[in-house]
Amino acid sequence: MNLSQTDAVDWLSTLKASSVDLLITDPPYESLEKHRKIGTTTRLKVSKSSSNQWFDIFPNSRFEELLTEIYRVLKNNSHFYLFCDQETMFFIKPIAEKVGFKFWKPIIWDKVCIGMGYHYRARHEYILFFEKGKRKLNNLSTPDILTYKRVYRGYPTEKPVDLLEVLVTQSSNQGELIVDPFFGSGSTLIAANNLKRKVKGNDISPAAHEHFEQRQKSHSMQIHK
């Protein structure tokens, strides 16, 4: 497992072209700022100050350079998954298509528990499913609604490892390289490692690295090279 702590786009630019088998990520997208200002999301849990200690927002203005780098580093015939909300989905989709990706569909993560808010309170999140070239999913019977209860073990945007294992299993094989440029709580890294994939991850936040280091220790992770 190879981890870095720098800007996501800068880090991706250091990876070789067509070297990555699968990329899964959950960037701290711009609309999160709106939610944490008005306190309508349990993803940010306590307060604006408590979420600020974990991550800085990645602005919409930088998504084209990010997606361009993601497309460059992915091998032909590979998949790319990005977690986001509805507002960000409408923004990202045309940019991803512009840089070369085929957009298949939004997969729904059903969190089981309802979130905070005022108008039809959300209990789901989107996982945008993109493809570079053409790659068959490993299990064609998997539905597009994935139901896994939301977890919170100290990191505000943590994803269930079981959920990430579905994506890793669907779009990669043992020994292939999985990359996450915004690894956050580290769930993607753990899922990939559990399934004996190679892993490279990056997050600019010192708090994310500290959290993941403690998570590794508490789970006594056996790192697969």
Regions found by a protein language model. Give the residues of each.
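Core catalytic lobe of class I
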Residues: M1-E210
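Short, conserved SAM-binding/catalytic segment
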Residues: E213-K225
